[in-house]
């Protein structure tokens, strides 16, 4: 048999012959899975002991016969899948088990972890092993390795590896900080790869700040987007603080013996940090040993920046999570350039983990002490390499240049370089699992934190870590390469290098090295402005001056700091970045390297380094069409020639508070800008009486400044005025006039952000997204409301916390380097609540997970994304579907062709309902098709009685492990439900009949289903549609379909044994005022109530009758040409009839009338949707024949002729029919059966049935489309083929409109007598 045969008969036949085709078994499984999705599903609740209040996770045994479930009563129940019976109870946890897993190979072995930090491995045949974490922290996830005796335990920011034959785990790996909690660990089915989910550090410090993806496509626009960063105190905490941490590393001292000092003032506030030493990480350590050797924070250190860093690092030793976040975004774009997407390589710039759980250190081996780099001579080798490539082993100084030994031990980690050789040319450090240091001797391990020259100095002992290379890689991977320039001689080379690092606006800027030069003892800290230049060319808006402060981030040729040499060659060699050369007009200013400068608080957005001038803002020069910088210089050297025309221009005023303006219409944008301008002008006028203030001298050596000439120089001084706003003091050039905003600014302000990152105009704007701060605040409120309602899973989806999924190669049992957030990132942002929030297919080729949507809302939408785990397209999103925040569980079918999404109750979003959809099943049909890549197949509905009103949420939903077996789910009410497919043709019924909900009997009796009459006419196409309507209407009248009763033959009339349902059971609605309101009852079901009426159940003194209508085949000939729009001659009888019916009801005479839509007058009877009055009872004694005739005369049959003959005929036919059925009562006499049969075939009423458009021939087949044809989309040609005798003899087959009750029927929709 050829490959790809999908015919099950051929496959089975070939298997019988002993020649099965390739993958034939899998094809059969796929066919089974496809077939079962179209079957009816039946739910079975598992009877659990103790009736737990909630069911959390589900797991299946490797032999697929057992299912384990965790519950809120701290127990674990084992259930047989086939029988649905609970067979085991595992008791022993002190708190709720949060994670659960079976061993994929060993039968009867199950592991569970609870919220108090206890891990238990249960043997269902008896016995268990347990281990308790030291801090009693909750166990987040567990994973058995398929082939090794190894259990992975995720708790807090650690992953423990436990061989349960030992008392405790033998090793542990940790993330870079305590806030990077590990939420999920999962092996692929073969155990070759390990999946980890770790909290993204960017979510922890400040949820209000945006997370800027560093994608290769977006990198050229990154600098433009930096225009839109937030206020001075909170701008870009991720990359900003990361670069600040980088600049806090000190290099070896200069040739003059100068010592290094702390470079980051924010890292000097070591008060709140009492954690262990993290010097091996290359971070600023706050332990007691390192703090004693650090210079205290200077008295004028700005507390705002320290507080901002402290706010981001209050739970860990230093803000080292930012570099991980920064590097994480670029890994996907770099992956395509590597030899393989994810090999067993790890970034050399990552933090390593502690291999020993008993270590007294912080638990993260992290970066072992990286030695300082020696100075390179002017003509250093490798001049063609990129800047920063010198931090290699070959660049180590003499005291720490020894190479590290190769790894030792079975559990050691093999590290390969992830940087391309032409980019970095460095060797990856190799770690051993036997110690927390590199392969060097213990004696040099600690001394390498500081060179001998720095041992006695009160300076920072920070080292140049591999993270510095990550910064270099970050720029170089996207900006390309250039040849480096020849470095200068002496210490100016180091100074120039430091300035180039700080001014790293242009990644192509060449430089001799990447290590940081030390500072002088008189001026220990560099300014924040100087450090912020590496913050991807940020332009920060100053609220006070209403201008964009460039934050001292000059380009390669702009003003040079004391480290900048005076050589003119340097200015001409370094080019300007292509993305910025149209923005700035650079003004190089030379200065001497020994000029001290007082420290200025960072909140003033001034340069507090050793610069001789400060950047006040940027102005737009209309003459040159460029942005020009405005500097503040020292008082004694104000010779900088600043363009007066530039000062008179206005900069864009896109503050974070006004982010919503970008999506407004130009008119609204201009109006908002005008309001801001007027408010700002009034604020300036309030301070206009203040005397002009001169800036303080910035340097004690003002003669060192020699500004470069600038065109349009009209003044040698710049006057500044100080003012206060929002509690802060600001300075602005006095001659920089304010101008009213113009509409022309609107176009210019929109170019700095990509559309997907543009915030909305506001909540109520149809085009925009909410501001980041507003969006985060509202989501926090919603999450708090939801979690207060007990839906922590939904709150987790609403919250701003995201997780990164990393895919680790475990074929060689290499420990995952989870401390490095930039390597092996499979999904950078996703939502994880528990183990049910992520699933790997049985074949290990697909990964399903929820990711946040780019479109913000209240709350955010989520996206179900299915990624590929195949080697050729690893990490590629194949399928996606949008969901609300209540999608909390996902499971891939055994064959990987369907996905089930478990839903929590949306009680805060939707009204309460009795029918709860708890899950949806989708078919994966077309990759890369967006929303159409998945097609919904069916919904999983929780079985609940209509009188029960409670919210039901899914905690976990899983497919049963074998194809076609079904699915199972656990709810927040403690239910464990197994759904199995049932063949819809097993009982001879159709799919649509089974898809309808069966209704509960509200009374003592029931009737047979009208679908049983489908056998009266072979090939009837209305059976399915009619039965759906029957069930709906019978539920309204309190009836339920039951098996059909035996039919009887009486006087040649074939009909079923009929019963009369007491009318009192059908009166549960009020009478509406509008007589023309159409009925919502699906009338064909009332037919069943009529055709099975039991007249013998009525009391003897009661008079009841069935008044049928004649079929359309006996309609009078003259009615054939009647106009439907022509008013009836008896239209006046309509109102009279309605009033008569209401009067009878008011007097208690009439108790029930069952009807259908406005267009029809009678409830449907029979399999053809015939329209017949069911019954009504008169309580005031027996009904005489005259009364019956009188009642029929009250509403004459509408039509061109008089209604009296038709009324008599109808009454006469009632007599014959009731006599046939054995009805006890008197009826009208005088018309024989033949005449009755002829008159029985009446006509449709155009006046009272506006849906009817044509008449019906009384002698031949019908050519018109009746009410049922309009409602059901079918003609009556099938009905016309029947002889009139059959129609007249069987009222259940009469599709006629009874005009006697035409009006009354339409007037009783929804009343107590209808339905």
From Swiss-Prot:
GO cellular-component term (any): cytoskeleton
Motif (TQT motif 1): 1053-1055
Motif TQT motif 2: chain residues: 1065-1067
Gene3D superfamilies found in the cross-reference section: YVTN repeat-like/Quinoprotein amine dehydrogenase
Biased composition (Low complexity): 696-715, 1009-1021, 1286-1307
Keyword list, A-Z: Autophagy, Cell cycle, Cell junction, Cytoplasm, Cytoplasmic vesicle, Cytoskeleton, Endoplasmic reticulum, Mitochondrion, Nucleus, Repeat, Ubl conjugation pathway, WD repeat
Subcellular location: Endoplasmic reticulum; Cytoplasm, Cytoskeleton; Cytoplasmic vesicle, Autophagosome; Mitochondrion
SUPFAM superfamilies: DPP6 N-terminal domain-like (SSF82171), WD40 repeat-like (SSF50978)
Pathway the protein acts in: Protein modification; protein ubiquitination
Null mutant phenotype: Morpholino knockdown of ambra1a causes impaired dorso-ventral patterning in embryos. Morpholino knockdown of ambra1a and ambra1b results in reduced autophagy and increased apoptosis during embryogenesis. Morpholino knockdown of ambra1a and ambra1b results in impaired locomotion, caused by abnormal myogenesis.
Gene Ontology MF annotations: protein phosphatase activator activity; ubiquitin-like ligase-substrate adaptor activity
GO biological processes: autophagosome assembly; autophagy; chordate embryonic development; gonad development; locomotory behavior; mitophagy; positive regulation of free ubiquitin chain polymerization; positive regulation of mitophagy
Residue ranges with Acidic residues bias: 716-725, 1091-1103
WD repeat windows: 50-89, 92-132, 134-174
Comp. bias (Basic and acidic residues): 378-388, 1022-1031, 1061-1072
Region (Disordered): 294-322, 342-409, 426-463, 502-526, 545-610, 630-660, 681-736, 985-1134, 1181-1208, 1286-1315
Superkingdom of the organism of origin: Eukaryota
Compositionally biased region (Polar residues): 351-360, 394-409, 426-435, 552-581, 633-647, 1047-1060, 1076-1090, 1125-1134, 1181-1193
PROSITE patterns, per database record: WD_REPEATS_1 (PS00678), WD_REPEATS_2 (PS50082), WD_REPEATS_REGION (PS50294)
Family named by the database record: Belongs to the WD repeat AMBRA1 family.
Protein purpose: Substrate-recognition component of a DCX (DDB1-CUL4-X-box) E3 ubiquitin-protein ligase complex involved in cell cycle control and autophagy. The DCX(AMBRA1) complex specifically mediates the polyubiquitination of target proteins. Acts as an upstream master regulator of the transition from G1 to S cell phase: ambra1a specifically recognizes and binds phosphorylated cyclin-D (ccnd1, ccnd2 and ccnd3), leading to cyclin-D ubiquitination by the DCX(AMBRA1) complex and subsequent degradation.
Quaternary state and interactors: Component of the DCX(AMBRA1) E3 ubiquitin ligase complex.
Protein name as it appears in the record: Activating molecule in BECN1-regulated autophagy protein 1A
Species the sequence originates in: Danio rerio
